[in-house]
């Protein structure tokens, strides 16, 4: 009996539970029906509101239906025929489809894609709306992803769902989970599916509910007439209503114009080079240097902004890869000028990749009246690798480049790598050694580029290089500049493969090795790029069966090549095109080339002592300074008298010479040449002569040096100067210009006025200091030398007896107390032309001669000193400067008592008095 009672009790319990379930079910159904009645009316009036939502996803808001329908006005952009709508319930999602008879889909959309679609998913409405509305535009202040109710300060949580009684629904068909009287009724009939999963109890008055689609469709059909009336009225006031709601009415949105950087625009034109992302109505002509993605970025298949000028190879790639209409592509021939808006343009090979080009722009220069007065040449390098052969391009040879748009990718001293042919040769050598039939070779490439290595390997090994189908199609576009037979798409016939740079990693190389089915036992990869190793041609890394070579093969100019390019073309202005977004960066880039300009601009005195012609200097600096003076009364030429003071560390003598000039008004072209070469090694001037005289001018040139070049005692200066003056007066009656020994200026006497030229040029002063330093160092070296003891020599001496001295000899006159007459010792490079030069070799130095002078004078001539001494002498005296025989320093001993001292002996000795470099 107990078992029967238990069964009965269980049956009764189950019956009660079933009754409770039915009761709960009926109660919930009644509640939902009541809610449906209230929300249906609201939904029918709010349906048009959803069509005005312009964001990608929205959330609907509903109220209790107490709004007055008469106060509602539909959006202005809904036509009468657009008022019918369809709402379909599918798995808790409402799909709203609206038919637009007057709607025209965009060109790239199908008819089905042109209609608006509203997708309700997880309490969110996804709204897709076309962009071609004539009268409507989305407000700026509305988020394009979600539109939250203005009165709601929270967002829906899709993970939680609540009922009216506060209990949770687990959304499960299992009846064991219905402990809280929750009913999960999952029926396949969408028309009778009252879903309770999305009912949520909120403290606010807004909630969402998904209703039966049949009821909604019926309500829509019943209210069509009402909507048609309202829409016909709103056509008149649609724009005003939109303005009240804050919408901006415009047909097409305007995008902000991008301003291109200066290095993308050719100065003086509206030409844009490699700047397609900055396309606008301001530019109608666009230039593409080569087909690399960082240069053609901005070009799409819908390009219609202007002509694209490029080479034939690049034009084929633009059409093939990007799908640009052929009518916008202008393929230009190599090395041929074309005219675009009055500007001549030419494409030259840039040695970068197939089809890459330098672009030369020749822009006419006009005056205010519009007349052409000249032309300006601008060169844009794009990406290039400089080669000496570019100097011989017919369109560039001898042309002055005003602006150079420079590819400065490797403008850094650390990027110095060998030339391309050398790197290709090294790679080919490695392949030849390692190609044993069991090695797979990988070569990193770009879309285009690095083809020279591939062609060399295929030529050397006699096998083509495998490329992908896409790569092969690209190479076919370049068939005019490379051999397409060197490439194949069959990887089974060759161990050489061209891969992308990303494939040159350890794991990728291993995977390729494994996929070869043991055909290859090891793999070698080459990464040809100049970024990897500066100043090293090839480096490698070995790891198991993989070997990785980093090759300094670059298709950009190295640092040295950039300097060679600038040094050759010498543009007026350099405009960098890489990493130049700030003035500091531009300044640092240009600093690498500043020395190339400075060395050309500086005119230093050092050039006078080099083996370079100095004709221009003398003709410009001493122009009309050494021309003959014409006596207007006698119509005769007055001889030019030059007074030269010679400095050999110590001021030992003065030499006065008078140069007779031919009585001819024509230039002396038969005696002078156009250049002057100074031989620094021998301290001599060549026998070439410089034309320094011209007609129609007159001047008297004197170069006088102050006496304090050297440290001499006042007594010696006075005695020597007095004797010099006496001797010069006796021997040269017409010369009165040797008395001023305290002037350190170049005096030009021209009739009445005196033109004084000081040596105050900064370059002259800086070089003079350098020369003084050299002389000072030489003097110190000479003071430390051990000099030989003078030997006594007997011989017959005349009044103008001379002593020949070499630059290494030092001579000093030993004074005597019993000398009755003062003697002067004159040193001059021109004194070797005197009549007594035959007696120079017979002179010997005597230490015990009683007629030796008191003063000790140093007469040694270091090499650098004789350069300076001769320089000032030559500037002053055309005879001494351009004499046929090189001058030799000498000492001239002069006596006032010629008859008494014929047999006397003159003794010279060495003095090591303090020597100071001369100052300006």
From Swiss-Prot:
Keywords: Coiled coil, DNA damage, DNA repair, Nucleus. The keyword DNA damage applies. One of its GO terms (biological process) is double-strand break repair via nonhomologous end joining. GO terms for molecular function: 5'-3' DNA exonuclease activity; damaged DNA binding. Residues 62-147, 163-201, 236-256, 711-742, 777-865, 880-920 are annotated as: Disordered. Residues 84-95, 115-127 have a biased composition (Polar residues). It is found in: Nucleus. Residues 163-200, 715-742, 777-841, 856-865, 890-920 have a biased composition (Low complexity). Signal peptide: none annotated. Belongs to the DNA repair metallo-beta-lactamase (DRMBL) family. May be required for DNA interstrand cross-link repair. PANTHER family: DNA CROSS-LINK REPAIR 1A PROTEIN, DNA CROSS-LINK REPAIR PROTEIN PSO2/SNM1-RELATED. This is DNA cross-link repair 1 protein. It comes from Dictyostelium discoideum.
């Amino acid at each position: 009996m107990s078992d029967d009672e238990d069964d009965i009790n269980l049956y009764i319990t189950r019956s009660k539970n079933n009754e409770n379930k039915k009761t709960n079910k009926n109660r919930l159904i009644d509640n939902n029906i009541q809610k449906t009645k209230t929300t249906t009316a609201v939904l029918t009036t709010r349906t048009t509101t959803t069509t005005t939502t312009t964001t990608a996803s929205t959330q609907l808001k509903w109220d209790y239906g107490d709004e007055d329908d008469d106060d509602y006005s539909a959006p202005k952009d809904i036509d009468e025929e657009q008022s019918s709508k369809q709402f379909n319930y599918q798995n808790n999602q409402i799909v709203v489809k609206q038919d637009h008879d007057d709607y025209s889909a965009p060109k790239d959309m199908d008819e089905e894609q042109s209609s608006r679609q509203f997708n309700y998913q997880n309490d969110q409405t996804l709204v897709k709306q076309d962009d071609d509305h004539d009268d409507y535009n989305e407000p700026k202040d509305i988020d394009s992803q979600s539109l939250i109710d203005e009165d709601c300060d929270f967002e829906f949580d899709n993970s939680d769902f609540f009922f009216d009684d506060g209990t949770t629904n687990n959304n499960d068909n299992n009846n064991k989970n219905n402990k809280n009287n929750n009913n999960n009724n999952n029926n396949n009939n969408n028309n009778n599916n009252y879903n309770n999963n999305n009912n949520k109890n909120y403290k606010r008055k807004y909630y969402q509910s998904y209703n039966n689609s049949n009821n909604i469709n019926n309500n829509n059909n019943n209210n069509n007439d009402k909507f048609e009336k309202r829409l016909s009225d709103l056509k008149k006031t649609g724009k005003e209503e939109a303005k009240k709601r804050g919408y901006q009415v415009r047909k097409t949105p305007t995008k902000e114009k991008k301003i291109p950087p200066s290095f993308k625009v050719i100065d003086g034109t509206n030409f844009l080079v490699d700047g397609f992302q900055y396309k606008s109505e301001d530019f109608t002509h666009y230039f593409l240097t080569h087909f690399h993605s960082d240069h053609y970025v901005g070009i799409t298949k819908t390009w219609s902004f202007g002509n694209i000028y490029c080479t034939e190879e690049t034009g084929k790639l633009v059409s093939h890869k990007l799908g640009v209409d052929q009518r916008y592509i202008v393929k230009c021939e190599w090395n041929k000028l074309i005219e675009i808006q009055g500007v001549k343009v030419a494409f030259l090979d840039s040695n970068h990749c197939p089809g890459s080009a330098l672009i030369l722009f020749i822009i006419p220069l006009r005056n205010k009246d519009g007349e052409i007065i000249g032309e300006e040449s601008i060169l844009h390098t794009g990406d290039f690798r400089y080669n000496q052969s570019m100097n011989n391009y017919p369109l560039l040879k001898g042309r002055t480049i005003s602006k150079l748009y420079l590819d400065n990718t490797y403008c850094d001293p650390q990027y110095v790598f060998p030339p391309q042919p050398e790197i290709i040769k090294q790679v080919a050598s490695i392949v030849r050694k390692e190609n044993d039939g069991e090695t797979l070779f990988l070569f990193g490439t770009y879309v285009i580029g690095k083809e020279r290595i591939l062609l060399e390997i295929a030529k050397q090994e006699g096998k083509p290089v495998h490329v992908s189908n896409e790569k092969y199609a690209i190479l076919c576009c370049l068939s005019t500049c490379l051999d397409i037979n060197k490439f194949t798409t069959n990887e089974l016939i060759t161990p050489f493969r061209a891969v992308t740079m990303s494939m040159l990693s350890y794991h990728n190389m291993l995977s390729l090795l494994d996929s070869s089915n043991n055909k290859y036992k090891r793999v070698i990869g080459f990464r040809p790029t100049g970024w990897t190793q500066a100043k090293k041609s090839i480096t490698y890394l070995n790891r198991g069966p993989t070997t990785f070579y980093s090759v300094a093969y670059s298709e950009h100019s190295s640092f040295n090549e950039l300097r060679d390019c600038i040094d050759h073309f010498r543009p007026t202005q350099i405009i960098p095109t890489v990493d130049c977004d700030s003035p500091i960066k531009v300044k640092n880039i240009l600093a690498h080339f500043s020395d190339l300009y400075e060395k050309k601009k500086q005119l230093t005195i050092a050039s006078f002592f080099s083996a370079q012609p100095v004709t221009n200097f003398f003709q410009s600096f001493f122009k009309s300074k050494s021309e003959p003076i014409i006596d207007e009364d006698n119509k005769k030429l007055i001889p030019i008298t030059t007074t030269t003071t010679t400095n050999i560390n110590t001021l030992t003598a003065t030499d006065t010479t008078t140069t007779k000039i031919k009585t001819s008004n024509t230039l002396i072209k038969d005696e002078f040449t156009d250049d002057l070469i100074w031989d620094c090694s021998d301290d001599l001037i060549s026998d070439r002569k410089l034309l320094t005289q011209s007609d129609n001018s007159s001047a008297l040139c004197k170069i006088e040096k102050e006496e304090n070049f050297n440290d001499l005692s006042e007594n010696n200066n006075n005695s020597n100067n007095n004797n010099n003056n006496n001797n010069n007066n006796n021997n040269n009656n017409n010369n009165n210009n040797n008395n001023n020994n305290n002037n350190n200026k170049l005096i030009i006497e021209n009739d009445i006025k005196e033109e004084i030229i000081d040596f105050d040029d900064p370059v002259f002063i800086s070089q003079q200091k350098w020369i003084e330093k050299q002389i000072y160092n030489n003097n110190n070296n000479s003071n430390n030398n051990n000099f030989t003891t003078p030997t006594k020599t007997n011989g017959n001496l005349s009044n103008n007896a001379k002593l020949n001295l070499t630059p290494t000899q030092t001579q000093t006159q030993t004074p005597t107390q019993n000398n009755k007459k003062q003697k002067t010792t004159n040193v001059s490079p021109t004194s070797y032309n005197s009549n007594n030069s035959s007696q120079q070799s017979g002179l010997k130095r005597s230490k015990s001669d009683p007629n030796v002078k008191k003063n000790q004078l140093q007469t040694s001539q270091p090499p650098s000193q004789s350069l300076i001494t001769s320089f000032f002498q030559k500037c002053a005296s055309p005879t001494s400067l351009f004499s046929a025989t090189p001058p030799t320093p000498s000492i001239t001993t002069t006596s006032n008592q010629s008859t008494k001292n014929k047999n006397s002996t003159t003794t010279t000795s060495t003095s090591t008095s303090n020597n100071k470099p001369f100052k300006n």
